[in-house]
Amino acid sequence: MEKTKDPADRSSRSERKRRDSFGMFDGYDSCSEDTSSSSSSDESEEEVAPLPSSLPIIKNNGQVYTYPDGKSGMATCEMCGMVGVRDAFYSKTKRFCSVSCSRSYSSNSKKASILARLQGKPPTKKAKVLQKKPLVAKLAAYAQYKATLKNQSVNKAPVTVEGFSWGNYITSNNVIAAPVTCFRHAPMGNCWGDIAEGVRIEVPNTDSNLPTKVFWISGIVKLAGYNALLRYEGFENDSSLDFWCNICGPDIHPVGWCATSGKPLVPPQSIQHKYTNWKAFLVKRLTGAKTLPPDFSQKVSENMQYPFKPSMRVEVVDKTHLCRTRVAVVESVIGGRLRLVYEESEDKTDDFWCHMYSPLIHPIGWSRSIGHRFKRTDILKKQESNYDAPSHLFIKVKDVEQGSEWFKEGMKLEAIDPLNLSAICVATIRKVLAEGYLMIGIDGSEAADGSDWFCYHASSPSIFPVGFCEINKIELTPPRGYTKLPFKWFDYLRETGSIAAPVKLFNKDVPNHGFRVGMKLEAVDLMEPRLVCVATVTRIIHRLLRIHFDGWEDEYDQWVDCESPDLYPVGWCQLTGYQLQPPAPQSNKDGQSNVSKQKKKSKSQPYKGHKKNFRKPGNRP
């Protein structure tokens, strides 16, 4: 029996460079450069320079927003009744204030209660995904919605995935799943080895009438992430007893384990009379075949150990003000995902979910070191049992040299909107921080106090040079209220007196990630990051992936980097004990589609880009 090779002996994956197709847009100049700056402080909120007073300013429930056209108008959510700025509402129809309300409305109308399941408490205690009241993350209506919540009594149904099976889903739809090797941050991602179709393993024999637990040898017929379709040896081309299981499960063993462990190998009773000499049959079938490495179970166990522990303190983005960080404490760790509770939360309900390799978390003192805004925590509320997470636990960013040709305030670029991850928008560098970090604002929809500026590192795969969308045939979302359509960068730079950020400063590295269009996976809904959902890769642009959540409309899609720690192989939730959100029933999707079709925007309206979903990252957990 041949063992699979240790992947450590393999050569590292080849790296290839993204073609530099943006040179034609590099060096756009204007008569003058708009470079506004703002002061900074170490551990307190700093004042941010307001946007030019020439733009109309709209106040909505305590938050101040500017709109170039001054024609925003108001709208009322058909689900929760909240009133707010129309342009801040979700979807093209502007019928709902948030993703949650849109989904809830559709679900309730079809008696499916999808949102109730999405926001409820999971049945498995191991998952510990806590139930809490939803927070509408629209910056324009956040305060009013919080007031509304106090007057409402919402009963949520427990989260359930009854009836959903990855195996049945893969088989019935005849689709493939992304291999485990695509997810280097996931358990076994770096040591999956030669596990492939044809590998033989020893598994429990469920086709037996014996009173004790017995085993038999099976072969992998098909792989889907951590899951494998298995067929007992002796069934040949008969698939009647094929079954799916998680390869990393405790009952999966390499061939030979039963012999060394003293466990009985018994053929399935359906075929036990097929051969008179099963030993000779197995010798013939297994000669030259591969099996799992003998230490496979040990490696799985080691890969399920995580360095972050409860009570560790970190700095994490403030989900109510994206421009600053706050101190949070690790409450629980599930599969490398952290449930962080903001240190000032007395009842531990003000939380935030992210992976331990997320660029949104940092060691204590990070904000001060780079000049990032920080919300100081009341020292009296600190618990003695909490301690600062060691700095070596955090993901390291790429070293950059901030020379004379570095990014400058006022430069234009294209960026994934952190409040609407389905859109890549026209953006501006609002502030240059230390160590390569930048504060980015989305043109046309920034809060006047800069509270929705977002911190990206210069090497981030979520920012792009001017012209990236045009060259790669991606719809670029123009500034809200911009009427000169179709949008042309050359004209916009001239009109705003701005220059494009130099192309050479952007990250052009493209790893050989292995993803293909149509592959299935489990993905975090970053608009409500406690949820991990059934998803599909629908488009690939270099290292950028378009992730679609099965059962939901395309407007819920999200742009994600191929190395994002928020993507996982099929079977990850089962392996770690996390709750998987199944696809929405087709009836609900159809209902939403019909509503959207009936209320399409009039062609006379000038703005045709994606509407920003004013949802703060992290408000689902």
Swiss-Prot record:
Stored PROSITE patterns: MBT, ZF_FCS
UniProt-listed SMART domains: MBT
Chain sites annotated for binding Zn(2+): 77, 80, 97, 101
Renumbered residue ranges of the record's region Disordered: 1-55, 581-621
Keyword annotations: Chromatin regulator, Chromosome, Metal-binding, Nucleus, Repeat, Transcription, Transcription regulation, Zinc, Zinc-finger
Listed Pfam families: MBT (PF02820), zf-FCS_1 (PF21319)
Compositionally biased tracts (Low complexity): 29-41
Compartments reported by the entry: Nucleus; Chromosome
GO MF term set: chromatin binding; histone H4K20me2 reader activity; methylated histone binding; zinc ion binding
Listed SUPFAM superfamilies: Tudor/PWWP/MBT
Span of the signal peptide: none
InterPro entries in alphabetical order: Mbt, PcG_chromatin_remod_factors, Znf_FCS, Znf_FCS_sf
GO BP terms: double-strand break repair via homologous recombination; negative regulation of DNA-templated transcription
Sequence intervals crossing the membrane: none
Gene3D superfamilies: 2.30.30.140, 3.30.60.160
UniProt GO cellular component terms: NuA4 histone acetyltransferase complex; nucleus
Sequence ranges of Basic and acidic residues compositional bias: 1-21
UniProt MBT repeat ranges: 164-268, 276-373, 374-479, 487-583
Known role: Chromatin reader component of the NuA4 histone acetyltransferase complex, a multiprotein complex involved in transcriptional activation of select genes principally by acetylation of nucleosomal histones H4 and H2A. The NuA4 complex plays a direct role in repair of DNA double-strand breaks (DSBs) by promoting homologous recombination (HR). MBTD1 specifically recognizes and binds monomethylated and dimethylated 'Lys-20' on histone H4 (H4K20me1 and H4K20me2, respectively).
Subunit structure: Monomer. Component of the NuA4 histone acetyltransferase complex.
Alphabetized PANTHER family for the sequence: MBT DOMAIN-CONTAINING PROTEIN 1, POLYCOMB GROUP PROTEIN
Protein name: MBT domain-containing protein 1
Annotated source species: Xenopus laevis (African clawed frog)
